[in-house]
């Protein structure tokens, strides 16, 4: 039995539910952590106290996605020019 034949046997409600889970999982594990990486890399040295606290909360919330993306992204901050 092929995969597409199996999908056609599933009810439309179940397919909709699987699609919703896939979209939410992609948002949680890929899209929001990428945006968070971008935001932290862009604003690290100019963040205020409240913004930094908010970002740390988001890091805690989206930690699984950040760990998933960490081997592929370089988050080294720019230092003082030391080599």
Curated annotation (Swiss-Prot):
Q: Which UniProt keywords apply?
A: Membrane, NAD, NADP, Organellar chromatophore, Plastid, Plastoquinone, Quinone, Thylakoid, Translocase, Transmembrane, Transmembrane helix
Keyword presence, Transport: no
Q: Which domain of life is it from?
A: Eukaryota
Q: What class of enzyme is it?
A: translocase
Membrane-crossing segments per the record: 17-37, 53-73
Q: What is its EC number?
A: 7.1.1.-
Q: Does the keyword Transmembrane helix apply?
A: yes
* Quaternary context: NDH-1 can be composed of about 15 different subunits; different subcomplexes with different compositions have been identified which probably have different functions.
Q: What does this protein do?
A: NDH-1 shuttles electrons from an unknown electron donor, via FMN and iron-sulfur (Fe-S) centers, to quinones in the respiratory and/or the photosynthetic chain. The immediate electron acceptor for the enzyme in this species is believed to be plastoquinone. Couples the redox reaction to proton translocation, and thus conserves the redox energy in a proton gradient.
HAMAP family the UniProt entry points to: NDH1_NDH1L (MF_01355)
Into which family does the record put it? Belongs to the complex I NdhL subunit family.
**Protein name (record):** NAD(P)H-quinone oxidoreductase subunit L, organellar chromatophore
Gene from which this protein is expressed: ndhL
């Amino acid at each position: 039995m092929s995969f597409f034949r199996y999908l056609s046997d599933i009810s439309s409600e179940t397919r909709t539910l699987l699609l919703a889970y896939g979209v939410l999982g992609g948002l949680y594990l890929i899209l929001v952590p990428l945006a968070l990486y971008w935001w932290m890399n862009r604003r690290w040295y100019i963040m205020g106290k409240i913004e930094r606290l908010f970002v740390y909360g988001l890091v805690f919330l989206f930690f699984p996605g950040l760990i998933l993306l960490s081997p592929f992204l370089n988050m080294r901050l720019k230092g003082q020019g030391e080599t």
